[in-house]
């Protein structure tokens, strides 16, 4: 009835997790404005996919509740950041189509490993669900007695919550890498570097999201991979990831010089 529906909507919109998301997104707006739209979209994707599973793919319920949650998050985050925004002047002006694009080989060097791991993991999960071999702790029970499900519904309902969360973050991270190849925001840079700030802000958050995903995926496949092939795959991915850490020596040296030479420390005069 209407009373139960109203209570349910209020409970979903005023969920403590939604309130915390609203606060932190408002905080992001004050600390780094770019994080405000980035994590509003990422949070929206996580909430939408979660609602799809929780409400058993009932279209109207999913979009109604997700829409109300999105409105609440936007409104509450604006209120949280309002004292700061009243005295803040944005540098960004307009959204433009990208005229220059990153060469494919450079994209592969920078992002090939995390994107390959993410999409390989998605393929593994889909294969398991189709073959009904998703046999690990946290997996929802099979719905053998129910009507035949669509492939998309079967995939979403067959994923453990942690897997769905990680896949959502991974897809969002891939989107953040690709977005500066399509559009950029006019701000403090011009000429050949007009995409620089847009690319830095988006790919920096993509790097963080990829880091969360890779840590989960490699351990997930090593512990619950199910086959030696997947365990070997995860170990190979771990070795490749460890090899990238070697670049830290070059990066630190290029910026700080010889860190073992105290006379080069600038301290407060840096």
Predicted regions and their residues:
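Membrane-interface transmembrane helices that cradle and orient dolichyl/undecaprenyl
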Residues: 1-13, 45-57
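Short, glycine- and charge-enriched coil/turn segments that flank and shape catalytic ligand pockets
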Residues: 12, 16, 53-61, 155-156, ...
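Residue-level signature of transmembrane alpha-helical entry/exit and packing/kink sites
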Residues: 14-21, 65, 69
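Membrane-interface alpha helices of multi-pass inner-membrane proteins
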Residues: 19-31, 79
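Carbohydrate-active enzymes and regulators
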Residues: 25, 34, 56, 60-65
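Membrane-interface helix caps and helix-loop-helix hairpins in membrane proteins
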Residues: 27-37, 185-190
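Transmembrane-embedded, aromatic-rich helix segments that form part
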Residues: 35-46
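Transmembrane helical bundles and short interhelical boundary loops of multi-pass, membrane-embedded
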Residues: 64-270
């Amino acid at each position: 009835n209407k009373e139960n529906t109203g209570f349910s909507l209020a409970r979903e919109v005023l969920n403590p997790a939604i309130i915390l998301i609203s606060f932190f997104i408002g905080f992001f707006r004050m600390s780094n404005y770019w994080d405000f739209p980035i994590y509003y979209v990422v949070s929206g994707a996580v909430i939408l996919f979660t609602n799809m599973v929780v409400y058993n793919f009932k279209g109207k319920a999913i979009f109604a509740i997700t829409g109300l949650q999105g409105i609440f998050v936007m409104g509450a985050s604006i209120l949280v950041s309002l004292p700061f925004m009243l005295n803040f002047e944005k540098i960004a002006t307009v959204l433009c189509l990208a005229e220059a694009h990153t060469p494919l080989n450079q994209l592969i060097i920078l992002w090939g490993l995390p994107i390959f791991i993410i999409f390989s993991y998605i393929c593994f999960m889909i294969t398991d669900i189709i073959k009904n071999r998703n046999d690990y702790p946290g997996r929802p029970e099979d719905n053998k007695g129910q009507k035949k499900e669509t492939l998309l519904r079967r995939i979403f309902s067959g994923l453990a919550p942690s897997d769905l969360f990680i896949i959502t973050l991974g897809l969002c991270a891939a989107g953040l890498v690709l977005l500066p190849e399509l559009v950029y925001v006019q701000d403090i840079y011009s000429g050949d570097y007009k995409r620089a700030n847009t690319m830095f802000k988006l790919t920096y958050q993509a790097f963080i999201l990829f880091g969360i995903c890779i840590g989960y995926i490699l351990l997930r496949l090593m512990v619950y991979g199910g086959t030696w092939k997947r365990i070997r795959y995860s170990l190979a991915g771990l070795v490749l990831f460890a090899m990238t850490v070697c670049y830290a020596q070059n990066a630190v040296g290029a910026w700080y010089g010889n860190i073992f030479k105290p006379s080069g420390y600038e301290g407060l005069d840096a």
